[in-house]
Regions:
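C-terminal catalytic "cap/lid" subdomain
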Residues: 1-2, 6-12, 16-29, 40-51, ...
Length: 250
């Protein structure tokens, strides 16, 4: 009963979000109807005995509701868009890493029937696993998921936020650049620039990664080489000096 009450509160919250985002009553009604389908599915799962797979399915319906709200908001802003259910193309292998070959094949088939629209919406981290169960990407950073999505959709570049507080920008340039190799050296030094597996994947498909710290400070990682001057300096705290004394023992 408590869960059902919480679910009703969630449905009411969705209605409030639609009221605040949308001005068209017709658009609100259509969005509410589509959201209701997913809420009913969540209710059905909650009435059964949820196991870990059911829990994933509940979260998947929540992700689709978020996509629907965004889609209807963009429609009202006259921005044509289309929702892609990431479970229809994204899959993890037995090693819990994305099965890139499988994903690319699915994307190619999916895009044949996809409307010609400028904006495609999908769900972050939602996928299927090797056993065809609803699952989620390992929590290793949204930038890695974005890199995988960009790679399989043949994107020229992806844009994500730079969350590390260890990165400080100096100088007048608004956009700084690093090559893939320079970025790897940065990451190897211990700086949390982005997930290490992003770089080799982006390099393989020739895709740039743009990291934004503030609207004025961006960092672009690509194959492009720019200049020979020093681009970055790494300063680490807690350096330990270790003195070794030989005991003369062989």
């Amino acid at each position: 009963e408590k869960v059902m009450n919480q679910l009703q509160d969630f449905e009411n919250d969705c209605g409030n979000w639609l009221d605040n985002l949308l001005s068209s009553e017709m658009q609100k009604a259509e969005a509410a109807k589509e959201i209701k389908v997913h809420i009913d599915q969540i209710s059905r799962l909650c009435n059964e005995n949820p196991n870990i797979i059911d829990d994933h399915e509940i979260m998947a319906h929540g992700a689709m509701i978020s996509s629907l709200i965004l889609s209807h908001y963009l429609e009202e802003c006259t921005k044509k868009n289309f929702i892609l259910n990431s479970c229809h193309f994204m899959r993890l292998g037995l090693d819990r890493k994305p099965d890139i070959k499988y994903v690319k094949k699915n994307v190619e088939e999916l895009m044949k029937d996809c409307p010609d629209v400028p904006i495609l919406i999908t769900q972050s981290r939602l996928c299927k696993n090797a056993y065809d169960e609803v699952d989620f990407f390992p929590q290793i950073g949204n930038e890695y998921y974005a890199t995988v999505i960009g790679a399989v959709f043949h994107a020229d570049e992806i844009i994500t936020s730079l969350r590390s507080d260890e990165i400080c920008f100096r100088g007048m340039e608004h956009t700084r650049t690093l090559t893939y190799g320079e970025a790897e050296n940065f990451i190897d030094s211990g700086i949390a620039l982005l997930h290490p597996e992003c770089i080799p994947l982006a390099r393989t498909v020739g895709m740039a990664i743009v990291l934004i710290k503030t609207p004025e400070d961006t960092l672009r990682i690509s194959s492009e080489k720019t200049g020979t001057k020093v681009k970055a300096a790494v300063s680490r705290r807690g350096v330990v000096f270790v003195k070794l004394r030989s005991l003369g023992i062989l």
